[in-house]
Amino acid sequence: MTIKREMRNDKRAAPKAPINENISAREVRLIGADGEQVGIVSIDEALRIADEAKLDLVEISADAVPPVCKVMDYGKHLFEKKKQANEAKKNQKQIQIKEIKFRPGTEDGDYQVKLRNLVRFLTDGDKAKISLRFRGREMAHQELGMELLKRVEADLAEYGTVEQHPKMEGRQLMMVIAPKKKK
């Protein structure tokens, strides 16, 4: 036996506002096409006004008593809403976590290059994860790693704040710095 299933889109359609003859109320509070309050009118009168203007009657607020309806071009209204949603989505910034790896014996030249990269990450608005890996006998000198991370923290104080203080995870010492909020 086969079971027939309906195909569904992954994007769920937003519940659409009732328009024109789909409005179930007998009386509505009507807002005209130019935004002025017409008042409380029967649904037939509201449909006639919308028809004369060659526009749609759209239910704006179904919860109100009586429901609020507006005379507008429904297709244009949907287009504007979609355009605003796309604009809001485009203006969002994804925050990423960038990682820089140090070693307990990192020399000054390498330290400056890595510090410059950390400054760039923080000024771009990304979080920075600083990891310091210990190998072999270096585990006996974890205080050197803590000193290095404290130095990094002091050098980056004007660009960011420590979100996660240095802590050991296995053979790695980790710290996370978040960018300072822009005023």
From Swiss-Prot:
GO MF assignments: ribosome binding; translation initiation factor activity
Organism superkingdom: Bacteria
Keywords tagged on the record: Cytoplasm, Initiation factor, Protein biosynthesis
InterPro entries linked to this entry: T_IF-3_C_sf, T_IF-3_N_sf, Translation_initiation_fac_3, Translation_initiation_fac_3_C, Translation_initiation_fac_3_N
Cited function: IF-3 binds to the 30S ribosomal subunit and shifts the equilibrium between 70S ribosomes and their 50S and 30S subunits in favor of the free subunits, thus enhancing the availability of 30S subunits on which protein synthesis initiation begins.
Similarity section: Belongs to the IF-3 family.
Name of this chain's protein: Translation initiation factor IF-3
Gene responsible for this protein: infC
